[in-house]
Amino acid sequence: QFPTDYDEGQDDRPKVGLGARGHRPYDKKKEEAPSLRPVPPPISGGGYRARPATATVGQKKVERKPPDADGCLHADPDLGVLCPTGCKLQDTLVRQERPIRKSIEDLRNTVDSVSRTSSSTFQYITLLKNMWKGRQNQVQDNENVVNEYSSHLEKHQLYIDETVKNNIPTKLRVLRSILENLRSKIQKLESDVSTQMEYCRTPCTVTCNIPVVSGKECEKIIRNEGETSEMYLIQPEDSSKPYRVYCDMKTEKGGWTVIQNRQDGSVDFGRKWDPYKQGFGNIATNAEGKKYCGVPGEYWLGNDRISQLTNMGPTKLLIEMEDWKGDKVTALYEGFTVQNEANKYQLSVSKYKGTAGNALIEGASQLVGENRTMTIHNSMFFSTYDRDNDGWKTTDPRKQCSKEDGGGWWYNRCHAANPNGRYYWGGAYTWDMAKHGTDDGVVWMNWQGSWYSMKKMSMKIRPYFPEQ
């Protein structure tokens, strides 16, 4: 960048008075000090002679004798000597030679100085021209850069305008819709929680009317003309006390005693040995507008009772399940027995039929070899997180199927089916949602895999009898 002495189109600036240097200020750092030019010598040589004096009237004219000038005298005495002699001329030239030589030398010096000054001036002018060209190139480059930045700014401005006018409102509408959806779900969950809190405010009791008809199990009740699916009292043995169960009188000709039911996650199945032994949960609730308990709740009938019922004679087990799309499958085992507590409620199942996959006998169909064998449930002991009877043989007490998979069950190492696992809304879940990072949902691997928790699952038993 160089300072300029030109206005460069700044005609619109306010006019100010010029200083002593006008518009060319002297910059001591960038300019040489100005030098004075030599003074030229005075002009020498002859001039006019003095004018003759004019005689006044009456004045006597005096004859003037011209001096001897070593030359020829003019005929007219007033004109004096015509020309000097050679010697006189030589003397005159000699007298005038020195000042003339000095004047010539001075002139030569003056010419040299003027030449040097002209060369410096030319160089300065050339420098100014180059500076001017450089300034013009800079101005052009700056204009190009400004134009380029202006183009970029215009594009960014258009993008911002487009984003602000279109994208952001669209995203805001989407977010608003999501928030409304979440608000609706939260309100529903709050309502469900309030309902469950009302259920759990006091120990679970049944306030429904219980039918008079009874029997040792639900098959006997249907044979005694108890045809409605609801809660009944059964008494397997005369020596035992009657207890409540839910009887399914519609599925596969009815007569099914429900020993387990999952449908809404309202009951925690992560319990100790004694609750699983005795049973827990809500057997049934009253149907809307009806005075009987026609809606099954979530419950586990109890290992002692299940063992008692299955040891009364050959027993079938029907497992029904439903996913979150409403699709349903079943697993029917025509042989089902649970041993007593002394034998750790050991499981025995046989003769599978159905559409869900034979998870209890064959293990997880996705696995092969030893890995599949470790998921077979048949012949396993019952385990809870405080009574470890599973098939996972490890010295690490933390490695326990019931603790990691959320419920009590006939675990191997660990499961292909997990009906008593943790309840996950929506079906699909991931390891980071699980308490221990395991597939701890209400799982039937042979149908929906490890990471899908069923919406509904129930286990029902009925005495075996020949079909007509």
Curated annotation (Swiss-Prot):
Tell me the keywords, alphabetical order.
Adaptive immunity, Blood coagulation, Coiled coil, Disulfide bond, Glycoprotein, Hemostasis, Immunity, Innate immunity, Pyrrolidone carboxylic acid, Secreted, Sulfation
One Pfam family, short name: Fib_alpha
Location in the cell: Secreted
Give the sites modified to Pyrrolidone carboxylic acid. Answer: Q1
Q: What is this protein called?
A: Fibrinogen beta chain
Coiled coil feature spans:
88-204
Q: Write out the GO MF terms.
A: signaling receptor binding
